[in-house]
């Protein structure tokens, strides 16, 4: 017998998260690790929980996540995006409040590439008039 589950892929910066929602008690597992031990920063944990808190369904689902690439901030954003998509798959009526909160839109900002002749993407070497 197969358990009902909802899937969502989330991306942010260079991170990609595969999120599975199953009806449960509210346990969030990231890469076979508890959420609180995976993310050191409280802000990253808050970001992950945002869509569930918005809909008041924090205790209704168990969340299983595999996330690759990027750093803690990008991974947290990718997980949030994946949870949002899975919640929309669960119930299309969730789309409107999640859209209003800005969780449905993929944050398209990426790191700007370093240019030749510059120190970083935009930082120029010191200019000397004489």
Swiss-Prot record:
Q: Which residues form a coiled coil?
A: none
From the Swiss-Prot or TrEMBL record, what is one GO molecular function term? RNA binding
The alphabetical list of record keywords is: Ribonucleoprotein, Ribosomal protein
* Transmembrane residue ranges: none
One Pfam family here? Ribosomal_S9
Biological process (GO) annotations? translation
Q: Which domain of life is it from?
A: Bacteria
Entry GO CC: cytosolic small ribosomal subunit
In terms of NCBIfam families, this protein maps to: PRK00132.1
Please name the PANTHER family in this protein's record: RIBOSOMAL PROTEIN S9, SMALL RIBOSOMAL SUBUNIT PROTEIN US9M
What is the name attached to this protein's record?
Answer: Small ribosomal subunit protein uS9
Q: Which organism is it from?
A: Hahella chejuensis (strain KCTC 2396)
Query: By which gene is this protein encoded?
Result: rpsI
